[in-house]
Swiss-Prot record:
PROSITE patterns: PROLINE_PEPTIDASE (PS00491). Its EC number is 3.4.11.9. Thermostable to 55 degrees Celsius. Complete loss of activity above 70-75 degrees Celsius. This is Xaa-Pro aminopeptidase 2. It comes from Rattus norvegicus (Rat). Pfam families: Creatinase_N, Creatinase_N_2, Peptidase_M24, Peptidase_M24_C.
Length: 674
């Protein structure tokens, strides 16, 4: 899944309009977006009336002596996905996009979001709200300074601001004679009142031993060893990100959409383990698993989730040093630790250690990708049979592939909202259809599906782009060059400890050669039944260096404005490369096992090395997936796999019509049944 760090190109406004209402922006109509210039304003049926909500919030602001209140789009753990009861910005503004910041003053209210969501915001917000399209903190503060008089207060919830965000706001407001005030009671929650969704209370459970790479005791020992060997000699480490605690204790639940996490903090010290969580969610068996009935160094002491600030403050009053990873620590807990007792790093030791999978974790992740490939292949076969009938749309397609994954062993649902995008909608890297707004899949258009699953043994993420008709020469070239980029990076051999950003350009080279590019990241880490976007692995400037045992996605793409989109994403394991001469070098081993669309590959563009690599990959797919399909008696899917992994030849381009594929499939099945 391409991560959301697109540049804010103006053309995305038009693309958003297209995505919301096919066939194009001309059909969008003024009734589908708000028009605040008329009296009374004209609002679409999708707009949310926020008048009473704003009045309730402003009442709380007045009680706290605030002239402005900042409402970000995250939770107290800096999570990528947030639970319903944490959707504060969405509730107060009506705007449900995944990225954006709201600010409410005594008289005005405004939302800042990037170009992916401009049209959505105009559809969902009423005229109580201004929409701002420059999303920097500097832009937000400039607006605040224009609206808030000298000497007045700007409030924020310290548990919703990372340390870095707080520092940026504080710096921008310095010398402005406006005061940034930390209010630990969230005012939106108070205004929301009884209508706010409850905090999840599903059981927190321990993963069966066969699905874990190490015991929680072994992991605790590894973190303590890290602290002992640290030059700053920290006595404790504070874990704030939800996947950190889930990984450390091999515990899972379902508090967060698409992520098997539960609300918690961990304060791990050299002599104690303190888990801040809702204690009532543990069974007796899980309590015994955590050794909660003792106070020894390998016993877990359970404390109430809401007491994290007081608990950290009390521990920090002693002769201690606390290590934090500032990327996922909020100002709410950072603020109570005296600066002389802080040891700060970008990422916590848990983030660094879990990024490198041990041999058992590697085997588990690989196994999950085999089953996942079966589900994706079943989906592609289903599409080939049903798209010509005109019965498949983007939304029904997304529902079908999600269900195919749920049918697999050890499934725990999708790992993110499936991106099912046809034609011009695929030009939006993060487009997802809805039951109300979607397009039919067509033989005459490209179709992109980016999807993934959560399984007890691993998390998956894969993207394939297909065309069932006759693609244009440009579409074939663009697709092939995206494939070339995927191959070039996947087969690369590079020195150990190389940063991902150093090699990232290999995925773009084939596109750059002809003046093409893509605006999202090239890859991200992936977890063992954890995050689909697992930091700090990847190809960005702030990712850690590549190391043997890491898993990363490799996902170049190309997006033609208003016409089509292409992305080819595989998950790869970083392994030691076999080189002619001695040295420690690394390369990638793909663990995604679904063939690319032969109908879109221009073999003449591939170098001999690229073609050889592709055919070798296809042979690997046959070896890993073929037996599984045969074991399950999925004969139609097996025939499809055999056809789509036939070796490609430089002398003869391979394109196969739907009709010929159906005939071949029927003959293959008939021959097996005779």
């Amino acid at each position: 899944m391409a991560q959301a760090y697109w540049q804010c190109y103006p053309w995305l406004v038009l693309l958003c309009a297209c995505a919301w209402s096919y066939p194009g922006p001309e059909s969008l109509g003024r009734e589908d977006v708000r028009d605040c210039s008329t009296n009374p304003p004209r609002l679409p049926v999708t707009a949310v009336n926020t008048t009473m909500r704003l009045a309730a919030l402003r009442q709380q602001m007045e009680k706290s002596n605030l002239s402005a209140y900042i409402i970000p789009d995250t939770d107290a753990h800096m999570s990528e996905y947030i639970g319903k009861h944490d959707e504060r910005r969405a509730w107060i503004s009506g705007f449900t996009g995944s990225a954006g910041t709201a600010v409410v003053t005594k008289k005005k209210a405004a939302v800042w979001t990037d170009s992916r969501y401009w049209t959505q915001a105009e559809r969902q917000m009423d005229c109580n709200w201004e929409l701002h399209k420059e999303v920097s903190i500097s832009s937000i503060v400039a607006w605040i300074l224009a609206e808030v008089p000298d000497g007045e207060n700007v409030g924020f919830d310290p548990f919703l601001f990372s340390v870095g965000s707080w520092e940026n706001y504080d710096q921008e407001l310095q010398d402005s004679n406006r005061h940034l005030l930390s209010i630990t009671t969230n005012l939106v929650d108070v205004a929301w009142g009884s209508e706010r969704p409850p905090v999840p209370s599903q059981p927190i459970y321990a993963l069966p031993k066969e699905f874990t790479g190490s015991t929680w005791q072994e992991k605790v020992s590894a973190i303590r060893s890290y602290m002992q060997n640290h030059t700053m000699a920290p006595t404790g480490v504070l874990l704030s990100a939800l996947d950190e605690t889930a990984w450390l204790f091999n515990l899972r639940s379902s508090d967060i959409p698409y992520n098997p996490f539960f609300y918690s903090y961990t304060l791990l010290t050299d002599s104690s383990i303190r888990l801040f969580v809702n204690k009532s969610r543990f069974s007796l068996e899980t309590l015994q698993y955590l050794n909660t009935n003792c106070t020894l160094p390998m016993c877990v002491q359970l404390e109430d989730y809401s007491q994290i600030r007081d608990g950290v403050k009390a521990y920090a009053s002693g002769n201690v040093k606390i290590l934090i990873g500032i990327s996922y620590t909020t100002y709410g807990v950072y603020d109570v630790i005296p600066k002389e007792k802080l040891v700060t790093e970008t990422y916590s030791p848990v983030m660094l250690i879990k990024a490198v999978k041990n041999s058992k974790e590697q085997a588990l992740l690989k196994a999950s990708h085999v089953r996942d490939a079966v589900a994706v292949i079943q989906y592609l076969v289903w599409l080939e049979k049903n798209v010509p009938k005109g019965t498949v749309d983007e939304f029904s397609g997304a529902e079908h592939i999600d269900q195919l994954r749920r049918n697999e062993n050890f499934s725990s649902g999708p790992s993110f909202e499936t991106i099912s995008a046809s034609g011009l909608n695929a030009a939006l890297a993060h487009y997802s259809p809805t039951k109300e707004l979607h397009r039919k899949l067509s033989l005459d258009e490209m179709y992109l599906v980016d999807s993934g699953g959560q399984y007890w043994d691993g998390t998956t993420d894969i993207t394939r782009t297909v065309h069932w008709g006759t693609p244009t020469a440009f579409q074939k070239e663009a697709y092939t060059r995206v494939l070339m980029g995927n191959i070039d990076l996947s087969r690369l051999v590079f020195p150990a400890a190389t940063s991902g950003r150093v090699v990232e350009a290999f995925a773009r080279r084939a596109l750059w050669e002809v003046g093409l590019n893509y605006g999202h990241g090239t890859g991200h880490g992936i977890g063992n039944f954890l995050c689909v976007h697992e930091w700090p692995v990847g190809f960005q400037y702030n990712n850690m260096a590549m190391a043997k045992g890491m898993f990363t996605s490799i996902e170049p793409g190309y997006y033609q404005d208003g016409e089509f989109g292409i992305r080819l994403e595989d998950v790869a394991l970083v392994v030691e490369a076999k080189t002619k001469y001695p040295g420690t070098y690394l390369t990638f081993e793909l663990v995604s096992f679904v063939p690319y669309d032969r109908n879109l590959i221009d073999v003449s563009l591939l170098s001999p090395e690229q073609l050889q690599y592709l055919n070798r990959y296809y042979q690997t797919i046959r070896e890993n997936i073929g037996p599984e399909l045969q074991r399950r008696q999925l004969l139609e899917e097996f025939a499809w796999l055999e056809r789509h992994t036939e070796p490609l030849s430089a002398s003869a381009p391979h394109t196969t019509s739907l009709a010929s594929m159906w005939v071949a499939s029927a003959l293959a099945i008939l021959s097996w049944s005779c």
